[in-house]
Structures are given as structure tokens and as C-alpha cells.
């Protein structure tokens, strides 16, 4: 807690993942204006694992003279993160299943108009900050996996997070992830 508080005082974003006794952090979190998020099945809180988040702030882009268009595809980076996530969830995934999952992810994002063009994640680039498109959720990916006979096993494993006991993960993000603590 002390380390997190020190980081907060320096303006460094800090997350504390406490699966066993997380409730012990609630009071400290609330005292400094933090966001206490309880991620469990049935929780009202949700972080959409499929959400593409713009990682650089406009201020940092100006300071570092980085153009987000030159950073590479945000979609490709997100798909890499999701492949890691699903690799942990399904450790015995075959190479063929990985390829099919990759293709299903690309199709799922395409359904929402999201491509490798970084501008495609925004609905309005003229506003500050730019307004982002609605992102797909696990249920959208699940539909694509169910359609392909070669990804039925993946669909069955993921169904727990779509219609099963952990279906609270099948929603849009409803917490403030930009909060520093």
C-alpha cells in the first residue's frame, strides 16, 4: 500500500491486484480518490478484454513527438495481447486453433468497422479527446468461433465467459481505467 501511495503522489498510474484480501485496499483507495474494482463473477464492474485503449495521451504525443498513426497497428497489438490471454486460458491450443482464433478476432473487429488503420477505432477524430467506437465483447468473438467447426472447442471453453458463471465479463468496460490509483 505504501509503494502504491508513493507512486500515486508522483502521478504514476498504479494497479493493485489482490485476489485474496482485496477488500483491505478499499478504504485507502477511496481516501485518495482511487477506483476500487472488484472483478469476480456477478460483479457490477467489468473490464472489456477486447477493448482497444489508446495508451498515449495527447499531451505525451506532443511532448515525445510521437504520432499514434506511426506507432503501428493498435489492432495488431491488441490481437497479440488477446492471443496471450487466450493462450493462458487455453494452454493446449494447437497452432491451427491459434490461426483460426486470430482470423476470428480480425473478423470480429471488422464487424465493428475496426481495421489495422488506427483511425478506424474512432467515430469522431475532431473532438478532443477523439471519441472511440463501441468495441466488441467476448460474445461477439464467441459467435464467430461457433460458426467454424474447427473452433468449436475454443467456443466451448470461452462460453463460460459469455453465457456461463463468469458472464459478467461479457460487457463493455464500465469502470474508469484512466484513474491513477
Language model feature labels by segment:
Residues 22, 26-35, 41-43, 50-181:
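P-loop NTPase motor domains
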Residues 14-17, 35-39:
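Short hydrophobic alpha-helical runs that function as membrane-insertion/retention elements
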Residues 1-19, 23:
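P-loop NTPase nucleotide-binding module
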Amino acid at each position: 500500500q505504501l509503494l502504491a501511495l508513493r507512486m500515486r503522489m508522483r502521478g504514476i498510474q498504479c494497479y493493485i491486484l489482490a485476489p485474496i484480501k482485496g477488500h483491505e485496499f478499499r478504504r485507502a483507495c477511496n481516501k485518495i480518490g482511487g477506483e476500487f474494482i472488484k472483478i469476480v463473477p456477478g460483479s457490477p464492474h467489468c473490464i472489456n478484454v477486447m477493448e482497444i485503449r489508446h495508451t498515449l495521451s495527447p499531451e505525451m504525443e506532443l511532448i515525445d513527438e510521437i504520432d499514434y498513426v506511426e506507432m503501428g497497428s493498435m489492432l495488431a497489438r491488441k490481437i497479440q495481447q488477446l492471443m496471450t490471454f487466450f493462450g493462458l486460458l487455453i494452454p493446449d491450443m494447437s497452432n491451427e486453433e491459434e490461426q483460426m482464433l486470430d482470423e476470428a478476432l480480425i473478423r470480429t473487429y471488422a464487424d465493428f468497422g475496426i481495421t489495422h488503420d488506427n483511425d478506424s477505432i474512432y467515430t469522431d477524430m475532431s473532438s478532443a479527446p477523439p471519441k472511440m467506437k463501441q468495441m466488441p465483447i467476448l460474445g461477439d468473438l464467441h459467435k464467430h468461433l461457433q460458426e467454424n467447426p474447427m473452433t468449436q472447442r475454443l467456443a466451448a471453453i470461452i462460453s463460460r465467459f459469455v453465457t456461463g458463471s463468469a458472464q459478467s465479463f461479457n460487457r463493455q468496460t464500465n469502470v474508469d481505467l484512466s484513474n491513477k490509483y
